[in-house]
Amino acid sequence: MNGTNRTSRKKQSKQHRRSNRSNSPQAISGQLSKKQQAILNAPVKFGDEVLVTIHGIGSSGEGVGRVDDFTVFVPFALPGETVKVAIDMVKKTYATGRLLEIVTMAHNRIDASCNLYGFCGGCQLQHITYEGQLSLKTQKVKDVIERIGHQNPDLVKPTLGPKEPWAYRNKMQMPVGGTKGDIQMGFYAMGSHDIVQGTNCPIQDEGNNIIAQACYQIAKEFDIEPYDEHTGKGVLRHIIGRIGQSGWMIILVTATEQL
């Protein structure tokens, strides 16, 4: 009986040592892919709150900074700013962060004119002066010319903008959603197909805003069923407006032949 117990204890001890080896950091590291290993070794982790100095602007208008030479993208941050950020995604070569606090503010930062800014996905740079926007666009082209084209960036001339940077869009495409009796009409939220309710956009031609508001009221009055892209059911999908010198064009995109 004693011999049997000793054998059993030896087996348990071996299994315990094997288990410890398999759960060691070295063993876990060996089981990870290169991508997973890179994420594990990143200087920031999901949920970290870090200070980031912004030195550039990304292709979607987000601020670009670095933490220990690791790139961090921060929406609504501007070059020259130091910001406090909550890391909300970590990839192999970069992370993204949510802006918590502006520690050092850029001289050309302003309050956005649109009360839906930051929710609607239509605009990304309303928090900077228009002159600042033009300067950022010029610098973006210079960076591409130099880094990818291997040309002298001084060849790029300053970006020219209109005298009035508002109410210039002559075409509007507005998604429709919600439910029958509670229709929603506006623009998609950033990075999603969730609709931000709003029929008055400051960068749209005023004619398009009139079209949007009229269609919204008519859809409510006649209780038209909005299209649901998840179920594939419903009627009204989009409102399209186009303003030209010869007149206005209004298009209703539906999922059925009749309203």
What do these predicted ranges mean?
Residues 2-259:
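Accessory RNA-recognition modules of RNA-modification enzymes
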